[in-house]
UniProtKB/Swiss-Prot annotation:
Matches recorded under Gene3D superfamilies: Cyclin-like
Keyword terms: Cell cycle, Cell division, Cyclin
SUPFAM superfamilies: Cyclin-like
MF terms (GO), sorted A to Z: protein kinase binding
Protein name per Swiss-Prot or TrEMBL: Cyclin-P2-1
Species: Oryza sativa subsp. japonica (Rice)
Family indicated by similarity: Belongs to the cyclin family. Cyclin U/P subfamily.
InterPro entries for this protein: Cyclin-like_sf, Cyclin_P/U, Cyclin_PHO80-like
One Pfam family hit: Cyclin
GO biological process, alphabetically ordered: cell division
Encoding gene per record: CYCP2-1
Length: 217
């Protein structure tokens, strides 16, 4: 099936006819869940011996020894349903997870999925959204304690080396990557409407200010 651009703003929560937020799940949740399930299966086949050092210690903090008692799709959906997490946040959270994999070799597996995903979504939400729920609320949605999540957030930030910026071009590249998952994930389509999307790095706002300044001269 050929990919087509839809007129709706995909990177906003679906809305009903009256403009209120609908309860339907953002399509990115389905695509990301499918992608992560394959990552977990591959990572658990290819798990290497644990490394030593500070980064390895922080990475081990995410290992809980237990696995989620629900599907990844249901788990990810909880954050859009109960914490009003926007689809942009899921894209940025996935970008963070990919950086961890490339940098310190931190990979999502069954034993760390709950903690790692909850923390990645929390940090991405703080970067993307103007207003956020408290850590204690996010912790409840993710099935963790507030103290646990706050500690994991700090470990996550150090693993990321506090490099949280996601530029427009990088954001777009991850959108395209998720779109390619359509052929593997059962026909989902990650429609893009980036002009309407929240711009994660603030570059659009900066460009607008520069344009306004130039026009005034």
């Amino acid at each position: 099936m050929a990919s087509t651009e839809l007129a709706s703003d995909v990177y906003a929560l679906p809305c009903g006819d009256d403009g209120t937020t609908a309860l339907s799940t953002p399509v990115v949740v389905s695509v990301l869940a499918s992608l992560l399930e394959r990552h977990i299966a591959r990572n658990e086949r290819d798990q290497a011996a644990a490394a030593d050092g500070e980064a390895a210690r922080r990475a081990r903090a995410f290992d809980s020894g237990t696995v989620l008692d629900m599907s990844l799709h249901a788990f990810l959906e909880r954050f859009s349903r109960y914490a009003n997490v926007s689809p942009q946040v899921y894209v940025v959270a996935y970008a963070y997870l990919d950086r961890l994999r490339r940098g310190d070799g931190v990979r999502v597996v069954s034993a760390n999925a709950q903690r790692l995903l909850t923390t990645a979504i929390l940090v991405a939400s703080k970067f993307v959204e103007d207003r956020n729920y408290k850590n204690s609320y996010f912790a409840a949605v993710g099935g963790l304690t507030a103290a646990e999540l706050s500690s994991l957030e700090l470990d996550f930030l150090f693993l990321m080396q506090f490099r949280l910026n996601v530029s427009v071009s990088v954001f777009q590249s991850y959108c395209r990557h998720l779109e390619r998952e359509v052929s593997y994930g059962g026909g989902y389509q990650v429609e893009r409407c980036l002009k309407k999307a929240l711009v994660c790095s603030g570059e659009a706002q900066a460009q607008q200010r520069q344009a306004a300044s130039a026009a005034a001269q």
